[in-house]
């Protein structure tokens, strides 16, 4: 069961439990049911409760620890304030917004919450392009809150730059074949930007995404290693999704940059469940409070995310003569070998735990006198302990 926390939060708990009841707990040849759940945010409360109900003495295998994100990711926040940045009033090519305020009196002379909410939507379209230009991004993943927001941003980038901002969308309203094709186009570098909802934040392994080909620019900014980028147009309302989003760019061999555009004022947005038939284009609304969401993310990750000015320039900060930006990556070692060497002891410990658990199972079989049934006369059972040791040695060798 992959992305277990997501399935449970979407209301599939009863379905999982019904399936679990129908699956034989032990087969006629003596094989017992093994239940494995996986996720980058495995320590969710829902997963722990399910483990208590369905598993016997569950073992938690975690290479990084609870609430962990790649050390090779820098989190950067740009606050979008329509009070101090009035450029939204004179935009020549504004982004087409979600239509939430189509029937509201939004005008610069009307200093209402609705006006500033609309202003934020317009500014975020501009800030996205500014981030791309400022960092000379050739490839990046851009996350939007809804499918409609993705479509609007795709149209906006195409109108503003054509090939310069070539992009494709990845969300639930696109047909499966189109989604597959768009993802492959992005991987093959036929387009520069992948615009997606959180559906793309889980389970996708997209590696090798240097966001700038300008090596001179990189060297001038003291970044002499490949860089990866994610732009969050809107923060996710589920803090665990932030971990999945930025996980696209933090890799053992490369440094990642996560830029989040956070509104300083409440933003009125469409709010829908899985059942909604309007596909995110009308219906109920809520007021989105991104500063609160940012605080939840920082608390969840136990960090303070650096804030940058509206120019989206990520400075090289000095403290006691040491470079801060990129320091985490430099301390770790930028090569894959350094990363593997760090994980080696943890992987060995996990392998030992697996060996102990499998050995305990074999001992329990012996205590139950299952030899009488001829189950352990089969070499694959009789030599189970040695077989497990052999397999784990191979696993450890392949990992480290």
From Swiss-Prot:
Protein name: ATP-dependent RNA helicase Ddx1
Record keywords, A-Z: ATP-binding, Exonuclease, Helicase, Hydrolase, Nuclease, Nucleotide-binding, RNA-binding
InterPro entries: Helicase_C-like, P-loop_NTPase
Family of this protein: Belongs to the DEAD box helicase family. DDX1 subfamily.
Any Pfam family hit: Helicase_C
Keyword presence, RNA-binding: yes
SMART domains, per the entry: HELICc
Catalytic activity line of the entry: ATP + H2O = ADP + phosphate + H(+)
Biological role: Acts as an ATP-dependent RNA helicase, able to unwind both RNA-RNA and RNA-DNA duplexes. Possesses 5' single-stranded RNA overhang nuclease activity.
Domain of life, per lineage: Eukaryota
Single annotated GO MF: ATP binding
Motif DEAD box: positions: 2-5
One GO cellular component term: nucleus
Gene Ontology biological-process annotations: double-strand break repair; embryonic development via the syncytial blastoderm; oogenesis; spermatogenesis; tRNA processing
Domain Helicase C-terminal: 115-316
Transmembrane segments: none
The EC number(s) this enzyme carries: 3.6.4.13
Domain Helicase ATP-binding: from-to ranges: 1-60
